[in-house]
Amino acid sequence: MTQEPLIAIVGPTAVGKTALGIELAKTFGAEIISGDSMQVYRTMDIGTAKATVEEMAGIPHHLIDILEPGDTWTVSMFQEKALLAIASIRSRGKWPLLVGGTGLYVQALTHELSFGDAPSDSSFREEMELYASRFGNAALHGKLAKADPNAAEAIHANNVRRVIRALEVIHLTGKPFSEQENGLARPRFDNVLIGLEMERQALYERINRRVDAMMEAGLLEEVHRLYQRGIQGQAIQAIGYKELYAYFDGKCTYDEAIEALKTNSRRYAKRQLTWFKNRSDAVWFHLEEPEAKAKIFDYVHAFLAGKGFA
């Protein structure tokens, strides 16, 4: 582990990570690295809740709008690009602030993931390879989604080798692959994880309102443009896109698509919160408390002062 600081803001979708990250970056001289697995895609702006240029307030943001929607993006690709971004940020005398929602992506940067000591089972791998050849990559990926939704979110269906490895580790250990990742990894930096949370019903209402706001802002049109271009694959599996694709395919009504979008967003928020509560040493701040934001700023200032950044 290096003594270089890395602060990450984590927590469920719609809790307010983006806005807080920008405020912290402006106050303490940081540049932001997006830990969201879908904000890398150009033209997918509304559904991924990207900050607008105005909201960014001149703060450099990294790993946003770097790929076309048809391109593949993996945990390892994120790790490589994020480490390069950190080196670049530090060369300018700034410090990196990771703002993320995808658990494995955050862990891939904060920790040195290693599976060299994990067990193996060649017969199980052969069985899974046969399954994929018979039923397809999506069916194999579906197995992982049932066993470990967090791992499935981070591993693309076409990365068959990685999917099989995840299933193999689950098969042999009885534990989620995503849990193994963190358990076998050492911290890469002097990490500080700031967890944001609020009362669950308040968060769910906030999610529902954000979905309504996204629709008013033009999410239907944004997704329809992708649909007309014939975009398939990883990008359109994101929440907000897959539900509206189903509507355009005639598989559900408009109202059913919106309700599915809200339901899936709430479920995702619950998974995110569970992930970070169980798999990280984040310091949690309840945003409904009056002094929560002031406490966060004091906490960050004290940490950076100890590192010579404040």
From Swiss-Prot:
* Record Gene3D superfamilies: 1.10.20.140, P-loop containing nucleotide triphosphate hydrolases
**Residues at which substrate binds:** 13-18
This protein's record includes keyword ATP-binding: yes
User: Which sequence ranges are marked TM in the entry?
Assistant: none
Task: Give the main EC class.
Answer: transferase
InterPro entries in the cross-refs: Dimethylallyltransferase, IPT, P-loop_NTPase
Task: Establish whether keyword tRNA processing is in the entry.
Answer: yes
Q: How does it assemble?
A: Monomer.
The protein depicted here goes by the name tRNA dimethylallyltransferase
